[in-house]
């Protein structure tokens, strides 16, 4: 199986950092929603933007579940390619979402961060699940 390198704890920490920022965004999403709206907005417009951002954050949490399941089950824990991809994506997401929260970026920016930093690693994690359980290949 090979020895454990620094990739495993680094991947775990970047996953948790990204998760913490997403949870923080759940708590403080009001300022980001207002940044997405014109200066004068109706309660219906606010509710629509709030629902869209909550849906995006829930999708992100669902993809976290996929990635954490693969990581904690050992399917991708020692796969260095997946670990490097995950570290790069989640570290980038942590930094980008921190700016998203503090600089009050528009809500459409979240979807770009979601695509490259949450969806892409989850898709590759799913491909590893299929390779390991469906095709019976070794995970590393």
From Swiss-Prot:
Q: Name one GO cellular component term.
A: membrane
Kindly give the membrane topology term recorded for this protein: Multi-pass membrane protein
Ordered alphabetically, the record's keywords are: Cell projection, Cilium biogenesis/degradation, Developmental protein, Disease variant, Glycoprotein, Membrane, Transmembrane, Transmembrane helix
Report residues carrying sugar chains. 79
The record ties this protein, via InterPro entries, to:
TMEM107
Residue ranges crossing the lipid bilayer per the database entry: 7-27, 53-73, 83-103, 113-133
Q: Which biological process, per GO, is one annotated for this protein?
A: cilium assembly
**Keyword Transport among UniProt keywords:** no
Q: Does the keyword Transmembrane apply?
A: yes
Tell me the disulfide pairings in this chain: none
Compartmental location: Membrane; Cell projection, Cilium
Record function comment: Plays a role in cilia formation and embryonic patterning. Requires for normal Sonic hedgehog (Shh) signaling in the neural tube and acts in combination with GLI2 and GLI3 to pattern ventral and intermediate neuronal cell types. During ciliogenesis regulates the ciliary transition zone localization of some MKS complex proteins.
Associated pathology: Defect in TMEM107 is the cause of the schlei phenotype. Schlei mice display Shh-related defects including, preaxial polydactyly, exencephaly, and disrupted ventral neural tube patterning. Mice shown decreased numbers of cilia in several developing tissues and organs. However, nodal cilia appear normal in schlei mutants and subsequently, no left-right defects are observed.
Quaternary structure annotation from Swiss-Prot or TrEMBL: Part of the tectonic-like complex (also named B9 complex). Interacts with TMEM237, TMEM231, MKS1 and TMEM216.
Q: What is this protein called?
A: Transmembrane protein 107
Q: Which organism is it from?
A: Mus musculus
This protein's gene is called Tmem107
């Amino acid at each position: 199986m090979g020895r454990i390198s620094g990739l495993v704890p680094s991947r775990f920490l970047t996953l948790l950092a990204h998760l913490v920022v997403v949870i923080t965004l759940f708590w403080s999403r009001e300022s980001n929603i207002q940044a997405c709206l014109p200066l004068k907005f109706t309660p219906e417009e606010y509710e629509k933007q709030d629902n869209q951002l909550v849906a995006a954050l829930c999708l992100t949490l669902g993809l976290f579940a996929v990635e954490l399941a693969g990581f904690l089950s050992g399917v991708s824990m020692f796969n260095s390619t997946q670990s490097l991809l995950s570290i790069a994506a989640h570290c980038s997401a942590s930094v980008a979402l921190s700016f998203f929260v503090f600089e009050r970026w528009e809500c459409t920016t979240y979807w770009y961060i979601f695509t490259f930093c949450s969806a892409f690693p989850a898709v590759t994690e799913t491909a590893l699940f299929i390779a390991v359980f469906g095709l019976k290949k070794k995970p590393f």
